[in-house]
């Protein structure tokens, strides 16, 4: 077999592999476009002001998702207020202060393991502990605490990876200039890793918005409009839980597709915000 034959076979092989890669990419994009287009075509016609600003009433025979939108915002607020200090603080300690490397490796392994656990298991544990053991009742508080446990490993690991991208020379330079340990972490490390930290937090919000399995057990199915403090201990369905209720229990597929459209738009907005803020903070 001469060199010319080998060269021809390589060209044929490369072209074949390139065509296969393009085919896989095209099928993936086509499937994504079809899925988004189908949901939008079924859901956008049902997005009326009455649906967005009203609430469901069996007596008046009306359907509205305003309580579910507010419950989703309540859940995000409760979860992020608790998980941000815990996750970012733990990541700073493990990366900058912890001296026992075996313990750090063990915690990192545990965090990575927890990220792979199905969310419905977190929901079951949250129901047994927060709802029944602590007697918090199904509501925003129990659901938010369950989500804290679920997304804490994600916040921890993404923050850790962002902190590790800061060159060691930056730390040594700050310490060499007389800065204390905490001042060095606050002014040098965090300022250079803020883009990755913010991006990870925004993506965590996206996971909260799309979560349903854990909240089925802990937040409840309530479709009643409540203020924040009442919703903390009252059954409060988020958008994803409401989608399940309307699609499976009430047979309101049009409303379910409208909720799915809102969730798709929220997910797109969150992802675009993560990319935009990440790039903007990185430039600054």
Each language-model region and where it sits:
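Glycine/proline-centered hinge or cleavage motifs at structural transition points of membrane proteins
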Residues: 118, 177-178, 191
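Interhelical loop and adjacent transmembrane-helix boundary motif
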Residues: 56-63, 215-264
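Hydrophobic positions within alpha-helical transmembrane segments of bacterial inner-membrane proteins
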Residues: 30, 72, 76, 80-92, ...
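Periplasmic/extracellular loop-to-transmembrane helix junction in inner-membrane transport proteins
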Residues: 3-23, 37-79, 100, 245-254
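Cytoplasmic-entry segments and transmembrane alpha-helices of multi-pass inner-membrane transporters
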Residues: 86-126, 154-161, 284
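Generic hydrophobic transmembrane alpha-helix motif, especially the helices
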Residues: 112-148
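C-terminal transmembrane helix and the adjacent membrane-cytosol boundary/short C-terminal tail
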Residues: 16, 160, 164, 202, ...
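Transmembrane alpha-helices
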Residues: 80, 158-159, 181-219
